[in-house]
């Protein structure tokens, strides 16, 4: 379900029951039950089907919008030999498309006519390998860039034209441009409305949408110009068209725009400085995030949030720099997903320092996966905000307090040690940076680490 919500291509091969038991209750059928949460699902009913089924599966994984693909392996069929004449699998190619020249021309015309345009960078920029082209378009036009939660790290947030990223909450600079812009060029984004993303804040904006999913165009928003196709090819076409029209010089006042962004960012950080540098005990959540942001080697780290309050607090304030250095997720908001996600990140990037920030409630959902990380040798660091409560409940569920819903306790450092990891406990703000340094060193030696941070229930959110 998480892969479906976040449009992530994964292959799932569940075992199925015997053919003559498919219709017998309570046997489970992937074909019948997964329809609403996958991109494609089928079952193998005879050995001769395997090559064709796998070709269709990998075609779906490599082309069009992302999503999970399921091939159910029926039990008795999988015990049979595949006939020699059925060994016919051929790896399907990736087929790329790009918008028509007329659509590109219309988009460039609209961009040049806009007084306050905005580039909206979605996950498709990352998955399409288009981060360099996004930066080039921004610098060619002087248009600032906002990154969605799944698109966070598509643009280096230190870049003077980057406004930052947003989940349901965002930076002040992003909030300003999202409210005041008269045109949005959405790149690699479905623009689907969600509690975990920023809305299109008025109907008076020109909306240009690029996506490789035709069903996403005008799904939730009225789109003026549709750029259907691969995001990188779309960006290259836009860049070429702008260069042709301007003699290579581009348009837009980069210095003036960058100056405004810098001023708004400085004002925003000044407002938040008391919390980001707070010395209170238990530790303020934003001080924890600030220490992570200050002390990590961003280009050699991969970080992620967890569902709920950690996501809301982390996304605006962590500075993503290089592509895929931040993994933004959570449209179905599964508590605890951060730990297995970072194990996967470590498997794919063993040289990187992989860290997830989570609450104590989320740890209750997947904390035993620290044993997996420890046993497998894929050493990660988990920073756990130990505040004894599920931070969402006090605001949205006033009756929960009567029954203790969301309340919890535990020595999580000790629990981690019981599963083969190293447990560190932080009770003072001054100890946070040394703990992160120690965690990096322990990870390098192959040891998984949990940092149990005694933190507060900070309620303030970056809502602009």
Which sequence ranges carry the predicted segments?
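Active-site diphosphate/adenylate-binding microenvironment
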Residues: 262-340, 345
């Amino acid at each position: 379900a998480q892969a479906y919500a976040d449009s992530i291509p994964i292959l799932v091969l569940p075992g199925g029951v015997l053919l003559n038991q498919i219709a017998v209750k309570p046997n489970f059928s992937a074909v019948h039950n997964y329809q609403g949460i996958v991109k494609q699902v089928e079952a193998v009913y005879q050995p001769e089907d395997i090559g064709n089924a796998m070709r269709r599966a990998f075609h779906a994984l490599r082309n069009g919008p992302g999503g999970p693909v399921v091939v159910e392996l029926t039990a008795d069929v999988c015990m049979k030999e595949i006939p020699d004449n059925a060994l016919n699998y051929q790896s399907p190619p990736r087929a790329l498309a790009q918008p028509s020249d007329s659509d590109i021309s219309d988009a460039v015309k609209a961009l040049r006519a806009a007084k306050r345009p905005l580039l909206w960078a979605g996950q498709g920029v990352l998955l399409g390998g288009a981060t360099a082209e996004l930066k080039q378009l921004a610098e060619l036009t002087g248009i600032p860039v906002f990154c969605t939660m799944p698109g966070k790290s598509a643009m280096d947030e230190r870049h003077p034209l980057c406004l930052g990223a947003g989940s349901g909450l965002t930076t002040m600079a992003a909030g300003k441009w999202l409210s005041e812009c008269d045109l949005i060029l959405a790149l690699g984004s479905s623009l689907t409305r969600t509690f975990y993303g920023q809305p299109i804040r008025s109907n008076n904006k020109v909306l240009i949408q690029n996506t490789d999913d035709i069903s996403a165009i005008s799904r939730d928003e009225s789109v003026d110009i549709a750029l259907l196709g691969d995001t990188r090819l779309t960006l290259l076409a836009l860049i070429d068209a702008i260069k042709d029209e301007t003699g290579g010089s581009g348009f837009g006042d980069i210095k003036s725009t960058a100056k405004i962004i810098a001023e708004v960012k400085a004002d925003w950080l000044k407002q938040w400085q008391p919390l980001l540098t707070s010395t209170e005990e238990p530790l303020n959540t934003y001080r924890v995030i600030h220490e992570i942001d200050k002390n990590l080697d961003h280009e050699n780290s991969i970080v992620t949030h967890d569902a709920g309050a950690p996501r809301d607090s982390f996304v605006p304030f962590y500075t993503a720099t290089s592509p895929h250095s931040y993994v933004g997720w959570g449209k179905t908001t599964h508590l605890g997903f951060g730990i297995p996600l970072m194990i996967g990140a470590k498997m794919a990037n063993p040289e990187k320092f992989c860290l997830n920030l989570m609450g104590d409630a989320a740890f209750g959902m997947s904390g035993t996966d620290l044993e997996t990380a420890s046993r497998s040798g894929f050493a990660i660091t988990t920073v756990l905000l130990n505040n004894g409560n599920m931070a969402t409940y006090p605001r949205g569920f006033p009756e929960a307090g009567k029954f203790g819903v969301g309340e919890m306790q535990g020595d999580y450092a000790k629990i981690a040690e019981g599963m083969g990891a190293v447990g560190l406990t932080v009770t003072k703000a001054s100890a946070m940076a040394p703990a992160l340094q120690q965690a990096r060193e322990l990870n390098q030696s192959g040891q998984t680490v949990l940092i149990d941070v005694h933190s507060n229930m900070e309620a303030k959110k970056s809502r602009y």
